């Protein structure tokens, strides 16, 4: 299952259901950007028991915004060029991600306005969703992996932006390999 990047509420509940199905049935899953965010929402709803968990993009008045707007975007009304864009360092600590990349630090391209709400990170990780990739400050979550799952990975960045025919994205290649097993 590949849940790509995107914006807005259209199809979001179906994407959340896809993440749940892949998680529960141990089906290989790769979420990219919005797919990363919605995998976090699904986990918060169904594993943490926060039934109203959501993204503040989808429910601005929600009580459990496990995905929230980037602090530097709060109050910005003009949506032109308001995203976190470009190549940023991702620090990887263990898990499948470090194995796939063969490195503990990589640069990947970003295009997003929302991120994992830091208030929920410890609760999420205590239940088995690990953020094995973080930005250079350690504050922003970049890669998630599920414990005890053959391949459930997601990235806040867009690995497809750097993928080439002769050098595919490690996360996409990992998904294909997991699907073949």
Residue positions per predicted region:
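Active-site proximal loops enriched in glycine and acidic residues that flank catalytic Cys/His/Asp
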Residues: 4-6, 31-42, 70, 92-94, ...
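Cysteine-nucleophile active-site neighborhood
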Residues: 2-88, 95-96, 165, 171-180
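Glycine-rich phosphate/pyrophosphate-binding loop
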Residues: 73-110, 117-119, 125
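Short coil/loop linkers at secondary-structure junctions
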Residues: 50-51, 103-104, 130
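Alpha-helical context
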Residues: 19-20, 73, 77, 100, ...
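Acyltransferase
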Residues: 106-181
């Amino acid at each position: 299952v590949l849940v790509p990047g995107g914006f807005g509420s259209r199809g979001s509940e179906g994407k959340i259901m896809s993440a749940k199905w892949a998680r529960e049935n141990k089906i290989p899953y790769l979420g990219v950007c919005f797919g990363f965010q919605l995998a976090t929402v699904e986990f918060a709803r169904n594993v943490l028991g926060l039934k109203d968990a959501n993204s503040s993009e989808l429910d601005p008045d929600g009580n459990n915004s496990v995905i929230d707007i980037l602090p530097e975007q709060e109050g910005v009304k003009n949506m032109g060029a308001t995203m976190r864009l470009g190549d940023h360092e991702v620090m990887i600590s263990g898990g499948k991600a470090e194995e796939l990349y063969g490195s503990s630090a990589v640069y990947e391209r970003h295009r997003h306005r929302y991120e994992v709400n830091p208030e929920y990170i410890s609760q999420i990780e205590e239940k088995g969703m690990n953020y094995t990739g973080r930005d250079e400050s350690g504050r922003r979550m970049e890669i998630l992996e599920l414990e005890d799952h053959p391949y459930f990975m997601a990235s806040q960045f867009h690995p497809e932006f750097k993928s080439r025919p002769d050098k595919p994205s490690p996360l996409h290649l990992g998904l294909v390999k997991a699907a073949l097993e």
